[in-house]
Amino acid sequence: MDKNAKSIVIYFSAQNHTRNIATEIAANINADIFEIEPVEAYTEDDLSWTDSESRVSREHNDVSLQDIVLKSVSVPNWDEYETVFIGYPIWWGGSAWPVDSLVKKVDFGNKIIIPFCTSHSSGLSTSDTDLKAKAASGNWQPGHRFSQDATDTEVKDWIQSL
């Protein structure tokens, strides 16, 4: 990773786990940060994946509900960034739908895209390559999975490995 390249960390976080990692990454590389925000925010009840009537369960079972309307898909000063970190929680083995919605709408051009995810128990799976397939452009790098309680040291070690 070019330490002189201007970077941004873009993330969606339903329960602050991904936000914590995103904030740590941004602080360590002096990057800007942009939160992906659905117009209709997810509540704790919405996120109850064991409840077949919860919002995420309905969205999981009906893909037509997975195109989430976002407050903004326009990242300020987008053209200035060379490197983009994209963070998301894992939902049903893939990236959270608000991230998918953003990735489908943004032109990444020749930017370097570095995905990262958080999960209590699921792995990265193919979420990084699935996002690449949904994007129209970008130089996508392999993703990295953090546990939801990853330490600052784990984040710093990963950044150093890039």
Positions of predicted regions on the chain:
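N-terminal beta1-alpha1-beta2 submodule of the flavodoxin-like/Rossmannoid cofactor-binding fold
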Residues: 1-83, 93-95, 100, 104, ...
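Short, aromatic/basic amphipathic alpha-helical patches
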Residues: 126-135
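A glycine- and small-aliphatic-rich helix-loop capping segment at beta-alpha/alpha-beta transitions
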Residues: 101-108, 135
